[in-house]
Amino acid sequence: MDHRELWPYGLRVLVIDDDCSYLSVMEDLLLKCSYKVTTYKNVREAVPFILDNPQIVDLVISDAFFPTEDGLLILQEVTSKFGIPTVIMASSGDTNTVMKYVANGAFDFLLKPVRIEELSNIWQHIFRKQMQDHKNNNMVGNLEKPGHPPSILAMARATPATTRSTATEASLAPLENEVRDDMVNYNGEITDIRDLGKSRLTWTTQLHRQFIAAVNHLGEDKAVPKKILGIMKVKHLTREQVASHLQKYRMQLKKSIPTTSKHGATLSSTALDKTQDHPSRSQYFNQDGCMEIMDYSLPRDDLSSGSECMLEELNDYSSEGFQDFRWDSDKQEYGPCFWNF
């Protein structure tokens, strides 16, 4: 494969500096990093170019101090309208100056003379930006829009690891881990109740699984709404909502009538009746139509860990309702308990 096809080769960088000599130095350094470079000597010329060609600019590097212009102008125009990552460079880097630019949207602040090592890794800002876009859109497909170049995320994934330089490989690894973590977080644990996309709270399978895990971790006697909420760590989920769910959960447990199944486990009679009425195993909802149904079981290797066991999700669904494993003191073993709201 031609090395010119590998990312971050061809990263499109626009550089702004009123010092023509240093502007030439920056251009040479960026070209050595295999980036495509466009240079301007002042902000007023650069901004119209960006406004007319936002799709061909991946990153802006701007000098902070101009004789007649404020470097913040480029930040305000570029970051607010197009979200193009902007890096500021300056000869001095006192705390107040750095904070001023970072607070106004700068992705990084480089001290002159800028080292080529810093420029060779400058692509990370574009990578993180597109990773954040991916997280906001909740799907990678939204990043590939007609009329726009392939996303940095897609190009980075398409670059074979064996053809990357050692430096690129080392710096890309933690970022790829962040992407994988985001994917697991999105498809796995719920971290913000607004991610469910509902106007009213819906106790989905995953949310209920986190609730049960918290209850089992605390133990039934110590499971109170405030502590459950602290363990679940779901933004915008209120203590009142957890308290209501906990009350319904405990009421259902009290209403369960022990019945011995063919496997010797303890089941509720209502659960057995529903099993006979609904022999097929597919996705169901409760009577209110607001809960997803799924089976849960404790990992076989963790049965000895009591109430602190975490729940393991099975890849099938049940019409019986939520299945929760409870400790049977008479049998000295765990048995499933089904419950619905």
Curated annotation (Swiss-Prot):
Localization: Nucleus
Domain Response regulatory: 12-127
Keyword list, A-Z: Activator, DNA-binding, Flowering, Nucleus, Phosphoprotein, Transcription, Transcription regulation, Two-component regulatory system
One Gene Ontology cellular component: nucleus
Single annotated GO MF: DNA binding
One Pfam family named in its UniProt record: Response_reg
PTM summary: Two-component system major event consists of a His-to-Asp phosphorelay between a sensor histidine kinase (HK) and a response regulator (RR). In plants, the His-to-Asp phosphorelay involves an additional intermediate named Histidine-containing phosphotransfer protein (HPt). This multistep phosphorelay consists of a His-Asp-His-Asp sequential transfer of a phosphate group between first a His and an Asp of the HK protein, followed by the transfer to a conserved His of the HPt protein and finally the transfer to an Asp in the receiver domain of the RR protein.
Induction record: Daily oscillation and diurnal expression in plants grown in short day (SD) but not in long day (LD) conditions.
Ranges where the HTH myb-type domain occurs: 195-254
InterPro entries according to UniProt: ARR-like, CheY-like_superfamily, Homeodomain-like_sf, Myb_dom, Myb_dom_plants, Response_reg_B-typ_pln, SANT/Myb, Sig_transdc_resp-reg_receiver
Keyword check for Transcription: yes
Gene3D superfamilies with a match to the protein in the record: 3.40.50.2300, Homeodomain-like
DNA-binding segment(s): 225-250
GO terms (BP aspect): cytokinin-activated signaling pathway; flower development; phosphorelay signal transduction system; positive regulation of short-day photoperiodism, flowering
UniProt cross-references to CDD domains, sorted A to Z: REC_typeB_ARR-like
Keyword match Cytoplasm: no
Primary localization class, coarse: nucleus
4-aspartylphosphate PTM sites in chain numbering: 63
NCBIfam families, per the entry: myb_SHAQKYF
Task of the protein: Transcriptional activator that acts as a floral inducer to promote short-day (SD) flowering pathway. Activates Hd3a and other FT-like genes independently from Hd1. May also activate MADS-box transcription factors involved in flowering regulation.
Descriptive protein name: Two-component response regulator EHD1
Gene this protein is translated from: EHD1
